[in-house]
A protein has these predicted regions:
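Alpha-helical multi-pass transmembrane bundles of energy-transducing inner-membrane proteins
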Residues: 5-93, 107, 176-242
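Predominantly late transmembrane helices and immediately cytosolic-facing juxtamembrane segments
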Residues: 112, 224-230, 293-328
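Short helix-boundary/re-entrant hairpin motifs in multi-pass inner-membrane proteins
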Residues: 95-161, 188-189, 255
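Cytoplasmic/organellar membrane-interface segments at the starts of transmembrane helices
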Residues: 253-255, 310-369
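Membrane-interface alpha-helices at helix entry/exit sites of multi-pass transporters
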Residues: 44-47, 124-135, 241-257, 291-301, ...
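Interfacial segments of multi-pass membrane proteins
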Residues: 32, 82, 122, 149, ...
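Alpha-helical transmembrane segments of multipass membrane proteins
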Residues: 4-11, 31-32, 65, 102, ...
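Alpha-helical transmembrane segments and their membrane-interface junctions
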Residues: 149-152, 264-282, 344-365
Length: 369
């Protein structure tokens, strides 16, 4: 159901249908969390639904204001009316519609102020479920913001808002990840921070920047899937999520350890992995737009992400094993190792041959600008 919903969100040119499919997706996300066997998963699913009862109606109200102004819910018709001056882009109703839909987008994306609940649902889902949740979040985030871009790009405040909340997500995501001892929460906060990089590219607004943002989105889906599955494998082998109670795992699970290390380096933007290529493009895009301070911030966040992974990797894999930690005879399912291996190959290939993907993304972006 979730896959069908995000596919429909990508394909639709009707903003009301987009909202309907987003609601279906939200139900699927709640179901994935509630079906988990992890403690307090029901509580987290309920919290997500309660917040959804605030964010979703606001988005729908914003769509209603657009309908009142343009007498249409077709995105192309609305965008044409706005850019041809048939709708006053400075009218209070139009600006209010932007604010309401933007608030709904923040909820859908898990950007601040919804970053804690989004990272929470990741930590309460099964590993494969968390990977699905993150992919759903990334795709819905892109689908909604591209629709908003087509409608509101004439307003300078739109791009400012996207960049501001994206930067806020980057800073809060990595800052909160540094404080975590539960590695599932740590990955959840880092995943939210990486969403900020995606929003940053789209908010800068140039073809190259949006291409970089969409390439970052693809990398985000693949890299976080590898990390969620890898850390899920560690939970499967140790029944433990607290990094303070782990250690010495490198000797017992070297394959998982190596693949998690490479995945962490990819998320931090270390060459020649795929995360480096997309973040390099984002830094270049920021410089070309005249914002060197954003480029510096992106580099600093990437360095902080690297520090998070070095700290976590040492705690879990390199330091001596605690005496009360039982690891003998506990293996990781081969299916998890296989899935991680496939994702790792894709990460390496995209890092070495980024043009295979970026050229197609650039053509797509050129078609919507």
């Amino acid at each position: 159901m979730g896959t069908a919903a995000v596919t429909a969100m990508i394909l639709t040119d009707d903003i009301f249908h987009m909202f309907v499919f987003f609601e279906i997706l939200a139900l699927a996300q709640v179901g994935i969390v509630a079906a988990s066997s992890i403690d307090y998963s029901y509580e987290m699913a309920l919290k997500y639904m309660i917040l959804g009862s605030i964010g979703s109606p606001m988005m729908l109200l914003g769509i209603g204001f657009l309908l009142a102004l343009t007498v249409s819910v077709n995105v192309t018709d609305i965008a044409t009316a706005v850019h041809m001056g048939l709708v006053d882009a400075t009218s209070p109703v139009f600006l209010l519609s932007l604010g309401l839909i933007f608030f709904g987008w923040l909820y859908a994306s898990g950007l601040p102020p919804f970053h804690t609940i989004k990272s929470g649902i990741y930590s309460k889902a099964e590993p494969h479920g968390a990977a699905l949740l993150q992919s759903f979040t990334v795709i819905s985030m892109i689908s909604i913001v591209l629709i908003m871009y087509r409608i509101y790009s004439a307003l300078p405040i739109f791009e400012v808002l996207v960049v501001f909340f994206s930067i806020l997500a980057m800073i809060l995501g990595v800052s909160l990840a540094l404080t975590q001892t539960d590695f599932r929460r740590m990955i959840g906060f880092l995943a939210v921070g990486e969403l900020g990089f995606i929003g940053l590219g789209i908010g800068l607004g140039t073809q190259y920047a949006i291409t970089a943002g969409l390439f970052q989105a693809l990398n985000e889906i693949i890299i976080t899937a590898l990390l969620f599955i890898g850390f899920g494998a560690i939970v499967n082998a140790t029944n433990e999520v607290d990094t303070r109670k782990l250690g010495g795992l490198l000797a017992y699970h070297p394959k998982v350890s190596l693949m998690l290390l490479i995945g962490g380096l990819a998320m931090a933007g270390v060459p020649p992995l795929s995360g480096f290529q997309s973040k390099l493009m984002l830094v270049q895009a920021s410089l070309s737009c005249g914002f060197p301070e954003i480029s510096i911030l992106a580099i600093m966040v990437s360095i902080a992400t690297f520090v998070v992974f070095v700290k976590t990797f040492y705690a879990m894999f390199l330091r001596p094993k605690p005496n009360d930690l039982e690891l003998e005879g506990k293996s990781v399912p081969k299916s998890m190792i296989f899935a991680m291996g496939v994702l790792l190959i894709i990460i390496v290939l995209l890092g070495i041959f980024p043009d295979v993907v970026t050229s197609g993304i650039s053509n797509f972006v050129g078609g919507i600008l």
